[in-house]
């Protein structure tokens, strides 16, 4: 019975994604963020079933505008011990939180009476 408990604990730990960020990231080549984008692409069916995940060019990209302030408001939920400076690159670990916020933000903006923001994520640069 004890070995079963250890096995179940190990399986649970393997299935739980890590939520901690031990220290502020200095740059996008930090070992903790290398390879994040390919992982996001592998998981895109779980994250956004009908969307592709195009590269975010910079913080001024239409898909990111307004999200940093939303992320700052929710930083206690996402990374309680971290400050959130400007997003530098799509490989930044902060994109993990931005993807879920992007879906939420897109839904909020689709209530816009002008309808200008009611695009799919992949259409945004051209809509």
From Swiss-Prot:
It is found in: Secreted. The modification Pyrrolidone carboxylic acid is found at residues 44, 76, 107. Keywords: Cleavage on pair of basic residues, Disulfide bond, Ion channel impairing toxin, Neurotoxin, Pyrrolidone carboxylic acid, Repeat, Secreted, Signal, Toxin. One of its GO terms (cellular component) is extracellular region. Residues 42-43, 73-75, 104-106 form a propeptide. Residues 1-20 form the signal peptide. It comes from the Eukaryota. GO terms for molecular function: ion channel regulator activity; toxin activity. The turripeptide OL172 conotoxin-like contains 2 disulfide bonds. Expressed by the venom duct. The cysteine framework of the turripeptide OL172 conotoxin-like is C-CC-C. Acts as a neurotoxin by inhibiting an ion channel. This is Turripeptide OL172.
């Amino acid at each position: 019975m004890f070995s079963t408990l250890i096995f179940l604990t190990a399986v649970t730990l393997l299935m739980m994604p890590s939520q901690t960020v031990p220290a502020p990231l200095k740059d996008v080549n930090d070992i903790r963020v290398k390879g994040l984008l390919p992982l996001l692409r592998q998981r895109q069916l779980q994250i956004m079933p009908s969307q592709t995940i195009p590269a975010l060019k910079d913080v001024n990209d239409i898909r990111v505008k307004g999200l940093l302030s939303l992320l700052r408001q929710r930083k206690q939920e996402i990374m309680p011990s971290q400050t959130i400076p400007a997003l530098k690159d799509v490989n930044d670990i902060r994109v993990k939180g931005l993807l879920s916020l992007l879906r939420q933000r897109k839904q909020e903006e689709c209530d816009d009476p002008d309808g200008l923001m009611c695009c799919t994520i992949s259409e945004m640069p051209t809509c």
